[in-house]
């Protein structure tokens, strides 16, 4: 009798688990990737002993890429406190122009030369615009560049998209902001990159502490799929 009761209890628990899993609707499929500009964010990490060589390679790649057909903006920056880490920020007219650039001889040469000194694999992420302003001139001087990778779990994609878009729309109005862009990864639409440029460190810090930014982080936290990874850089000369 006891064995029969245990068996019935096990069947009931299994049935309940099955009903629960079946009762949860799958997250909606992401929409098709739109045509138009491609925003490319690439993280480069070289050995500490090769930081100067890495900077030279990144500069050469930046300068050569600016001459490629379809290039709308190509910038490079070095991370504060970690001079062996860089970010490359590119904007291309469309996917075909980016694809052609990716096959260019100078791009292949850059990748080959970088492999000998890299600390981590070349991390390139292709995006389409979510909330961006006009394309300003390239950076320089005391400007502070913030680059943040935002990852939300797939069921929260639509909510995450709305939150990140609102942050960009609001932040472009803040004092000292020179650029605030939110872009969506083409191959994972629950992943975003936020690119922000501030007049100086004081205005960047003020934005990070204001009520709107803190409220955004509070709302995003339950949907997050990974650490909110914010990094600050200074443009390479």
Regions inferred by a protein language model and the residue ranges of each:
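Sec/Tat-exported extracytoplasmic proteins
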Residues: 61-65, 69, 102, 114, ...
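Short amphipathic alpha-helical segments
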Residues: 50-73, 106-110, 154-178, 212-216
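Structured core of small recognition/catalytic domains
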Residues: 158-237
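Bacterial N-terminal signal peptides
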Residues: 8-18
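Short, well-ordered beta-strand segments in beta-rich or mixed alpha/beta enzyme
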Residues: 37-45, 75-102, 142-151, 181-208
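Glycine-rich beta-strand-turn "strand-cap" elements at beta-sheet edges
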Residues: 24-36, 75-84, 109-145, 179-188, ...
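Sec/Tat signal peptide C-region and signal peptidase I cleavage site
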Residues: 20-22
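Bacterial N-terminal signal peptides that target proteins for export
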Residues: 1-9
């Amino acid at each position: 009798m006891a064995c029969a009761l245990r068996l019935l209890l096990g069947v009931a628990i299994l049935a309940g688990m099955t009903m629960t899993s079946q009762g949860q609707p799958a997250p909606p499929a992401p929409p098709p990737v739109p045509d138009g500009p491609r925003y490319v964010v690439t993280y480069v990490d070289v050995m500490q002993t090769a930081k100067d060589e890495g900077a030279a390679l990144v500069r050469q790649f930046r300068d050569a890429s600016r001459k490629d057909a379809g290039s709308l903006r190509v910038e490079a920056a070095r991370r504060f406190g970690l001079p062996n880490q860089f970010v490359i920020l590119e904007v291309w007219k469309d996917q075909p122009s980016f694809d052609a650039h990716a096959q260019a001889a100078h791009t292949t040469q850059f990748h080959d030369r970088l492999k000998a000194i890299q600390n981590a694999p070349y991390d390139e992420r292709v995006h389409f615009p979510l909330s961006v302003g006009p394309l300003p001139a390239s950076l320089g001087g005391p400007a502070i560049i913030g680059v943040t990778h935002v990852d939300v779990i797939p069921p929260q994609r639509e909510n995450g998209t709305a939150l990140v878009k609102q942050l960009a729309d609001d932040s472009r109005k803040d004092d000292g902001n020179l650029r605030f862009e939110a872009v969506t990864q083409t191959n994972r639409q629950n992943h975003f990159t936020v690119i922000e440029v501030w007049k100086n460190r004081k205005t960047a810090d003020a934005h990070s502490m204001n009520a709107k930014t803190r409220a955004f982080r509070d709302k995003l936290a339950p949907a997050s799929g990974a650490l909110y990874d914010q990094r600050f850089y200074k443009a390479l000369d």
